[in-house]
Amino acid sequence: MPSVRSVTCCCLLWMMFSVQLVTPGSPGTAQLSGHRTARFPRPRICNLACRAGIGHKYPFCHCRGKRDAVSSSMAV
């Protein structure tokens, strides 16, 4: 059974790639006229990544607190 951290990481990666593929104005994306493309806001991605302890892997996320060396969680 996959761990919560690996599932969270996979979900975050999937969301990031999805957002990148549907960003308006990027070349090669198919868009329906009159429809807004769905976006997943960066603050929400960063919040989830920071809580999961993997925020340091995303260059646009600036997690507050230090990594706890014993439990590998974020200390706030």
Curated annotation (Swiss-Prot):
Propeptide positions: the record gives: 25-39, 65-76
Q: Which cellular component terms (GO) are annotated to the entry? A: extracellular region; host cell postsynaptic membrane
On this chain, the residues bearing Arginine amide are R64
**Which pairs of positions does the record mark as disulfide bonds?**
C46-C61, C50-C63
Please explain the role this protein plays, according to its UniProt record. Highly inhibits both nicotinic acetylcholine receptors (neuronal (IC(50)=8.7 uM for alpha-3/beta-4) and muscular (IC(50)=0.54 uM for alpha-1-beta-1-epsilon-delta (CHRNA1-CHRNB1-CHRND-CHRNE)) subtypes) and the voltage-gated potassium channel Kv1.6/KCNA6 subtype (IC(50)=1.59 uM).
Domain free text: The cysteine framework is XIV (C-C-C-C).
Q: What is this protein called?
A: Alpha/kappa-conotoxin pl14a
Where is this protein localized, as stated in its record? Secreted
Q: Which domain of life is it from?
A: Eukaryota
Q: Please list the tissues where expression of this protein has been recorded.
A: Expressed by the venom duct.
Query: Which family does the UniProt entry place this protein in?
Result: Belongs to the conotoxin J superfamily.
Q: Name one GO molecular function term.
A: acetylcholine receptor inhibitor activity
Another remark in the UniProt entry says: No or very small inhibition is observed on Kv1.1/KCNA1, Kv1.2/KCNA2, Kv1.3/KCNA3, Kv1.4/KCNA4, Kv1.5/KCNA5 and Nav1.2/SCN2A.
Keywords, alphabetical: Acetylcholine receptor inhibiting toxin, Amidation, Disulfide bond, Ion channel impairing toxin, Neurotoxin, Postsynaptic neurotoxin, Potassium channel impairing toxin, Secreted, Signal, Toxin, Voltage-gated potassium channel impairing toxin
Q: Which residues form the signal peptide?
A: 1-24
